[in-house]
């Protein structure tokens, strides 16, 4: 039982515990520590019982203090007064690493627990706190710096953070500069940045609202401000993404700069940009830091599908904004698609085959292939498949695309095609032993795995593995359940098979809620938690090590669905997380780094420097 007295009790509380010999009472004073601290401070002010005098390194002013008090608040003083240091027995100690202002601030804090900071005394206080290892004061200094960062002082705060190794402050300053760099360009404050911080900013994917040409001009201004800075020209230019500039800007604004024509590194950067722009089809396999999208926004992306009500096929490309918890539109495809294949190489999204019209038999399959470039929010057509195909699987593996099986007006397909971006052409590789459609696939360890599907109107449970180096298929341990129109993905070293459908009895279809994963090293399957609701013919994507299953069709409910279910492999749990804007079957999903639409509205100003040849054959 706890007993507390009123306001006049001097903050006393008591805990009462009955025992055989009577009641034991434990008392606690809530004001004792502050009273003792005030008492020590008064002793210091009056010069009573002080047993050592501290002298700052920059003067002769003396500060009488109590050894025990200083040692209790500082590991530095504890080591000095209790270890084998010569200062242990000295009555007067000169602290050469601390000045008068800093030492007074530290002593006042130790005796009062209070600290006043401004930009005039901050560095003296920081230096003393760092030298004397007063961690609370260091924390207060960090809070003071972070809370006061502005366009006018961010460069100076960054310098202080770097000098005293204040990692949290340094990180905050970097983020502040990245967020406000356009404003710093306008004010000219960026010219005061040290090389290391400017190079970091220019290399960052988090730098927004600046074109590469603007960044190049800013770098040139910084270099020309002081002659010694020109030594950094090549190192600084490595952070400018010249391949993303237009050829006109490269000629008119970049090649006219003297050091870009004379410095070997800079000349090579221009050659790199020229070569990159001359080979638009190869770009996905030519990616580097200088050709990557300048964005740190990676999102779940969905594409196409057939609408539940009108059975109209969609051409929408959407991303899910996790912060706003809403779907946002990117550039739509030129033609609608469902039952298509999608894959990503070098953050370029390929859309292959599928259908533009609703047709459950696959008779309207197409062979066209398009590629989405998120840097410019634009689509371009590339070489078409050798065969029209839908209800097939598409994988990206070792810089190539593999289109596996499917169906068309000619029937079920066993053929497999490989797309080479370097040549912009499709060629046949080893076909499957039997035709398959409605199967699923994923890649792991340089191999492609294909599971289940439908062959001659029969659902399958087999797992096949394709090795692109040997151009051979091998059989692996079969799934425990036959399924088709399911999905498959890789997380870590496990290959997950999820959802789909199969026959109930002899003719009716049934959702498959059971899920399992395959271990390539053990060649065996392990069951996992079942889905909350059936989904077939879905989009699937792995985002932050969670599996997202998007849209599709529920055979038990006989309708397209709008739900998105998330599976957590670590917890073995399913959750319904959000919905699509509408119910869509035959939709596809992936993850892609993009410019969120508010940063790239329609993108008239974000012009692509790349022009593909008009012949798509």
UniProtKB/Swiss-Prot annotation:
The pathway this protein participates in, as annotated, is: Protein modification; protein ubiquitination
What is a single cellular component term in the Gene Ontology annotation? Answer: midbody
Per its UniProt entry, which superkingdom is the organism in? Eukaryota
**Which positions are tagged coiled coil?**
none
Residues of the BTB domain: 50-119
Start-end of each Kelch repeat: 299-347, 348-399, 400-446, 448-493, 495-545, 546-594
| Region Disordered, annotated ranges | 595-617
Give the Pfam families listed for this entry: BACK, BTB, Kelch_1, Kelch_KLHDC2_KLHL20_DRC7
User: Any idea which UniProt keywords this protein has?
Assistant: Cell cycle, Cell division, Kelch repeat, Mitosis, Repeat, Ubl conjugation pathway
Q: Name one GO biological process term.
A: cell division
Which residues are in the BACK domain?
A: 154-255
Q: What does this protein do?
A: Substrate-specific adapter of a BCR (BTB-CUL3-RBX1) E3 ubiquitin-protein ligase complex required for mitotic progression and cytokinesis. The BCR(KLHL9-KLHL13) E3 ubiquitin ligase complex mediates the ubiquitination of AURKB and controls the dynamic behavior of AURKB on mitotic chromosomes and thereby coordinates faithful mitotic progression and completion of cytokinesis.
The record's PANTHER family line, in alphabetical order, gives: KELCH-LIKE PROTEIN 9, LD33804P
Its subunit composition reads: Component of the BCR(KLHL9-KLHL13) E3 ubiquitin ligase complex, at least composed of CUL3, KLHL9, KLHL13 and RBX1. Interacts with AURKB.
- The protein's name is Kelch-like protein 9
Instruction: Tell me which species this is from.
Output: Mus musculus
As recorded in Swiss-Prot or TrEMBL, the protein's gene is named Klhl9
